[in-house]
């Protein structure tokens, strides 16, 4: 079941409104959409969101780590977010339109999965470039490689720019071709 995603301040009303529906609540955290708030505040926001009832946490990576090639810093950051999220699913938003190259997208995808991401997501939906097919292909192939090496199935979410059913069908077809029907 897909979750309803809200800002941290809206978790309590969302949990209350959805309490008997079986629909989980997700929260955008870590200074969404820029991800530039101080590290300790980003970690605290994740912890507070989980405590308030969020079952999924969407985090925004620090793009500066990818752009500077500091993959260890990105790993450590996402690993800390994973620990703060506890039992909640962790979705890492790569903001691919701001990563500069497909190579950075591939590396950021792999680093986030290695650090414990349950999903990797293209965009916040606020960037000037959101989900694209080339970026999605790179991310899906990273997921496939990670699965082949670890046996762990990581989810994928395209975000931003998908406004029609036919847009979604293109991405569903790509996912099915690259990963197979179990990812649908």
Where would I find each of the regions flagged by the language model?
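Alpha/beta enzyme core
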Residues: 1-3, 9-156, 163-184
